[in-house]
UniProtKB/Swiss-Prot annotation:
Residues 1-22 form the signal peptide. It comes from the Eukaryota. Residues 161-207 are annotated as: Disordered. It is linked to Immunodeficiency 18: An autosomal recessive primary immunodeficiency characterized by onset in infancy or early childhood of recurrent infections. The severity is variable, encompassing both a mild immunodeficiency and severe combined immunodeficiency (SCID), resulting in early death without bone marrow transplantation in some patients. Immunologic work-up of the IMD18 SCID patients shows a T cell-negative, B cell-positive, natural killer (NK) cell-positive phenotype, whereas T-cell development is not impaired in the mild form of IMD18. PROSITE patterns: ITAM_1 (PS51055). Gene3D superfamilies: Immunoglobulins. Phosphorylated on Tyr residues after T-cell receptor triggering by LCK in association with CD4/CD8. It is found in: Cell membrane. It holds the Pfam family ITAM. This is T-cell surface glycoprotein CD3 epsilon chain. InterPro entries: CD3_esu/gsu/dsu, Ig-like_dom_sf, Ig-like_fold, Ig_sub2, Phos_immunorcpt_sig_ITAM. The gene is CD3E. CDD domains: IgC1_CD3_epsilon (cd07692).
Length: 207
């Protein structure tokens, strides 16, 4: 790498993909952004070289040539695309660079630092989509909590016993069972005077 080079950072925050560019020309007064394109579909990551149109593109990963016939069948290159099938975050994360055949990787203007997490059923989403899902989930959860609260409150109110006053002509059933029947009553028949039983002489004055 030459002195006076510039590093720049681009991010794909949800996919944890960072891009650093390197400018190899000291005479350039400004910095031009030509980022690598990264697309993820399931467990496949596809990189697109930002420069050298019409040239045969070669790729390196951590200073090692990749994308040739001798490489793994899960890694392949087609024109300016590099396909990484069954991407592994531990083994395939790192620096990537593309350059035309006949030149050196050190002469490339941009490098890519790639770190991505993939899964078979993953779906790429932007920040607004994630925020919308979170807000909707909070609203639905809050609505369900309110419904449960008011339902339990109404159920408790209906479960309270309702008693009628004496003016309405009724008493509670519990009181009717505990209180004895009024006197006089056939259940309390007086002792006959003609019989001399054990209790025949009790309370004769009142009888």
């Amino acid at each position: 790498m030459q002195s006076g080079t510039h590093w720049r950072v681009l991010g794909l925050c949800l996919l944890s993909v960072g891009v650093w560019g390197q400018d190899g020309n000291e005479e350039m007064g400004g910095i031009t952004q030509t980022p690598y394109k990264v697309s993820i579909s399931g467990t496949t990551v596809i990189l697109t070289c930002p420069q050298y149109p019409g040239s045969e593109i070669l790729w390196q990963h951590n200073d090692k040539n990749i994308g040739g016939d001798e490489d793994d069948k899960n890694i392949g290159s087609d024109e300016d695309h590099l396909s990484l099938k069954e991407f592994s975050e531990l083994e395939q994360s790192g620096y990537y660079v593309c350059y035309p055949r006949g030149s050196k990787p050190e002469d490339a203007n941009f490098y890519l630092y790639l770190r991505a997490r993939v899964c078979e059923n993953c779906m790429e989403m932007d920040v607004m989509s994630v925020a919308t899902i979170v807000i909707v989930d909070i609203c639905i959860t809050g609505g369900l909590l309110l419904l449960v609260y008011y339902w339990s409150k109404n159920r408790k109110a209906k479960a309270k016993p309702v008693t009628r006053g004496a003016g309405a002509g009724g008493r509670q059933r519990g009181q009717n069972k505990e209180r004895p029947p009024p006197v006089p009553n056939p259940d309390y028949e007086p002792i006959r005077k003609g019989q001399r039983d054990l209790y025949s002489g009790l309370n004769q004055r009142r009888i």
